[in-house]
Amino acid sequence: MCIRDRHDISPKRIKPEDFFAVVEISKGSKTKYELDKETGILRLDRVLYTSTHYPANYGFIPRTYAADKDPLYVLVLCSEPIQPMALIQCYPIGMITMMDNGYADDKIIAIPFEDPTYNSYHDISEIPRHVFEEMSHFFSVYKSLERKETAIDEIQDRAAAVKVIEEAIETYIELYCR
């Protein structure tokens, strides 16, 4: 399946509490990919400069528009690395609000419905502390050798994540569907 951009999926598949995410970067990877909007093919943005690697599968929620003018980004906690460009049905458990080079950059934290290792968690407060600390550490340092500043602002619960997803879906609809 070719996903040319965040528009190429039925709106019925994107709800605040049950959505399909597009994975761009597999858990454990140091390669930062982004979906090329012109071709729909993943392109290498960069190899991370630090020795860190993505602590979770990373991608975006199609048919959303966030404050940074990109789709809403999502960390998918899963027991296995998921191949880039895979669709994965998820539900949100929380979010990380952070600053990236002086700009707000929210990251939704989600769980796949079909991963028995993680699908018993329903709020960020339930995940093992070490999993949370790995995510926080990663986003605090992953751009440090590029001389770019990142800082975790706060961790918010499931209700806050659902609200941010609702707003990003509504903004998308206002921009592209009216």
Language model features with spans:
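Conserved small/polar residues in nucleotide/adenosyl-binding loops
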Residues: 1-5
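Extended, highly charged
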Residues: 7-13
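Betabetaalpha-Me/HNH-type nuclease active-site subdomain
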Residues: 15-59, 63-72, 77, 84-87
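Solvent-exposed, non-transmembrane amphipathic alpha-helical segments
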Residues: 43, 62-64, 85, 94, ...
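Short, surface-exposed, polar/charged, turn-prone segments marking secondary-structure boundaries
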Residues: 49-52, 63, 87-88, 102-105, ...
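Short, intrinsically disordered, mixed-charge
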Residues: 63-66, 77-79, 137-144
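Short, structured beta-strand-loop surface elements
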Residues: 71-126
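C-terminal, well-folded lobe of enzymatic/effector domains
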Residues: 115-178
